[in-house]
Design a protein with these regions (language model features):
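Phosphate-coordination/substrate-recognition cap region in phosphate-metabolizing enzymes
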Residues: 1-23, 29
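Residue-level signal for well-ordered alpha-helical positions
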Residues: 13, 24, 58, 79-80
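Short glycine/proline- and acidic residue-enriched helix-loop micro-motifs
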Residues: 24-43, 123
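Glycine-rich phosphate-binding loop signature in dinucleotide/nucleotide-binding domains
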Residues: 55-62
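Generic beta-sheet signal
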Residues: 62-70
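Short, active-site-adjacent cap segments at secondary-structure transitions
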Residues: 72-74
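Domain-level recognition of soluble alpha/beta enzyme cores
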Residues: 81-107
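Acidic, His/Gly-rich catalytic cores of divalent-metal-dependent hydrolytic chemistry
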Residues: 108-123
């Protein structure tokens, strides 16, 4: 697994529950503020783009499945100006990577692997 596809580093919030953040950082979530050490979108885009380009060069003309957290996918979609839509659980997004092109990454639509309610509670 390539660590460059990891979830956003949330700094001092790492390991805390939503309730703990609300208690210890009142108003931060509602105001969309971030604590010290919270990874910037630029940092995420830089590391994920480098990882995608490396894969494209390793498998030229091939298709590769990358599993990443929805937060990382949303940051990449925002960076490429295709929206900030929610990524459903077990959903994803296609990224077409052409290392030698002017536009290295082209972003596709959000996809759902399963229709809502199609998966039973056994998962």
């Amino acid at each position: 697994a390539d660590p460059r596809f990891r979830e956003t580093d949330v700094g001092e919030w790492q390991g805390l529950t939503h309730d703990q953040i609300e208690r210890d950082w009142p108003g931060y979530l509602e105001a969309h503020n971030r604590p010290p050490g919270f990874e910037s979108d630029i940092s995420i885009v830089t590391r994920v783009t480098a990882a995608l380009v490396d894969l494209a060069e390793q498998f030229p003309g091939g298709e590769v499945l990358v599993v990443a957290h929805a937060g990382v996918i949303r940051v990449m979609r925002r960076a490429h100006r295709v929206g900030d839509s929610r990524i459903p659980n077990l959903g994803g997004c296609e990224f077409i990577v052409r290392p030698d092109a002017t536009e290295v990454i082209t972003v596709g639509d959000v996809v759902e692997l399963f229709e809502h309610g199609e998966i039973g509670e056994e998962l």
